[in-house]
């Protein structure tokens, strides 16, 4: 009988040959998912039988199907968000922006009116809404397929979030709350067009990832909506490509309606977020 330990060894070798960046971790996460246990528990189950479906799941990963599609979830802080084909998979670095957002309003119950632009799976809004259950949140998404995933996550983790179908490049969007919002967050499409990225990237919806030759198309246009939404003194935080920090800061500076324009770094020290306040 093939043991789980032996199957993990073989799976790790298979995934390594396929170019997967973290073959052992992925193999263990697949096994833990199928066994219904935590990843750390795998070390105690090396002599167990191989769970049904393990070989097929490893083969899917070897074809560079995103691990999160195989597991059906993606971690976002304390949440395991539902994801699958048709929605952008949240990345760990976005938790930095989510944590920043919660800190901006956590101490003042009067300043908890928040908008998440380009919500995708609902990652930012769900994280914030789960942490601040009395917050008023609006989440905007253009893609109906992604919005379906977002609503599923809001229903489970942050039912107070109101999902809005709309285009964040339209400065008139959400006109009924213009000038009243305390905080805007966004993880918009920001990757420069390229055909040389990891295969998994291209399984996210193109419109959720890429934003023109320099990755700035959406950010350049959405700044006007952000300004319209925020009240004076309201804050904004945007995730961006690690090559465009200067360009994003320039967008807010040249607009003329923002001050306190600052950079946030991800956990590896890369400049990945710009924050600002409406004057």
UniProtKB/Swiss-Prot annotation:
GO terms for molecular function: nucleic acid binding; protein-(glutamine-N5) methyltransferase activity; protein-glutamine N-methyltransferase activity. The keyword S-adenosyl-L-methionine applies. InterPro entries: DNA_methylase_N6_adenine_CS, HemK-like, N5-glutamine_MTase, PrmC_N, RF_methyltr_PrmC, SAM-dependent_MTases_sf, Small_mtfrase_dom. Coiled coil: none annotated. HAMAP family: RF_methyltr_PrmC. This is Release factor glutamine methyltransferase. NCBIfam families: hemK_fam, RF_mod_PrmC. It catalyses: L-glutaminyl-[peptide chain release factor] + S-adenosyl-L-methionine = N(5)-methyl-L-glutaminyl-[peptide chain release factor] + S-adenosyl-L-homocysteine + H(+). Pfam families: MTS, PrmC_N. It comes from Corynebacterium glutamicum (strain ATCC 13032 / DSM 20300 / JCM 1318 / BCRC 11384 / CCUG 27702 / LMG 3730 / NBRC 12168 / NCIMB 10025 / NRRL B-2784 / 534). GO terms for biological process: methylation. Substrate binds at residues 187-190. Methylates the class 1 translation termination release factors RF1/PrfA and RF2/PrfB on the glutamine residue of the universally conserved GGQ motif. S-adenosyl-L-methionine binds at residues 141, 187. Keywords: Methyltransferase, S-adenosyl-L-methionine, Transferase.
């Amino acid at each position: 009988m093939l043991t789980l330990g032996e199957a993990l060894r073989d799976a790790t070798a298979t995934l390594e040959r396929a170019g997967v960046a973290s073959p052992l971790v992925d193999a263990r996460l697949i096994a833990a998912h199928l066994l219904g246990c935590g990843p750390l528990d795998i070390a105690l189950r090396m002599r167990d039988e191989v769970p049904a479906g393990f070989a097929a799941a490893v083969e899917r990963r070897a074809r560079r199907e995103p691990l999160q599609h195989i597991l059906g979830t993606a971690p976002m802080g304390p949440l395991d968000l539902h994801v699958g084909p048709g929605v952008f998979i949240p990345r760990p670095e976005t938790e930095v922006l989510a944590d920043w957002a919660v800190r901006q309003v956590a101490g003042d119950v009067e300043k908890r009116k928040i908008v998440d632009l380009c919500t995708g799976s609902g990652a930012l809004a769900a994280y914030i809404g789960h942490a601040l259950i009395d917050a008023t949140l609006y989440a905007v998404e253009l893609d109906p397929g992604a919005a379906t995933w977002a609503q599923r996550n809001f229903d489970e983790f942050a039912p107070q979030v109101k999902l809005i179908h709309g285009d964040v490049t339209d400065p008139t969007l959400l006109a009924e709350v213009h000038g009243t919002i305390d905080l805007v967050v966004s993880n918009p499409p920001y990757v420069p067009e390229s055909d040389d990225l990891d295969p998994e990237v291209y399984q996210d919806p193109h419109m959720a990832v890429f934003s023109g030759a320099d990755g700035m198309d959406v950010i350049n246009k959405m700044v006007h909506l952000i300004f319209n939404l925020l009240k004076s003194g309201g804050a904004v935080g945007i995730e961006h490509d690690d090559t465009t920090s200067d360009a994003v800061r320039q967008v807010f500076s040249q607009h003329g309606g923002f001050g306190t324009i600052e950079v946030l770094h991800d956990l590896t020290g890369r400049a990945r977020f710009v924050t600002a306040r409406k004057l």
